[in-house]
Amino acid sequence: SLSGTYNQITQAGIELIGYRSLKAEWACLSEAGKICRTLGLTHLTLELSDAQFVPQILRTLQLNDAAADAFQTAFFAKELSTYQDLIAPLATNPLYPFLQQWPWLFGDSETIFAELKRLLPSNVITDRLAPLQQTVAFLKDQFPELRVTIDLTSRPPQSYYTGIFFHAYVDGGHQYLFSGGRYDKLLASFQQELLPAVGLAFDIDAVTDQLPNAPDQPLTFVYGLPSQWQAAAA
């Protein structure tokens, strides 16, 4: 039943299907950046995450299913006391220094990458972080005015995301202007052959809320007889 609340979102978006290359993410983000630039949406922050980062760390820790589920629940819910209890038995694991800092690994991209380089084995950096690093470098080259942050502590907004996911907002804004990511298994319910896909969607209401109000145009009144309508309308 309907609750009576306004729960509709007007969106406009981009979807690229069939491209496994990281350039698909770049193409979507580039178009979104150009749109924001054209609309004069400045002071924009783009936050990047990776849907596979948490699963890879859990595989590296070799936790059983029950322990992995408890770990993810506490981690994503920011239940830090429970999280600390769960990582305590891993004190001798090489990843333990990373696990201690993990809940706070979000913020400026350069700072986060420096911390990860210090805390993680090089193979993890290469496997999962290289696409994020390359994407940050691309964005800073194409959109130097853009603030790019990394968040490796957030749950993907949809379970079907399989790689990089992202959202953008302006300083002081309460809504995402656009969001999206890679979802290579979304079409699994409709066909046997999986197609890689990347997409993003703009929240039209959030975008229009950030646009400057158009200046009032002066009204011009033209008086005339009905027979003079065409001349008056011209």
Where are these regions (language model features)?
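A short alpha->loop->secondary-structure connector
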Residues: 39-43, 64-65
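Short, conserved phosphate-binding/catalytic loop or strand-edge motifs used
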Residues: 8-12, 48-56
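Intrinsic-disorder-associated interaction segments
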Residues: 47, 64, 76, 105-109
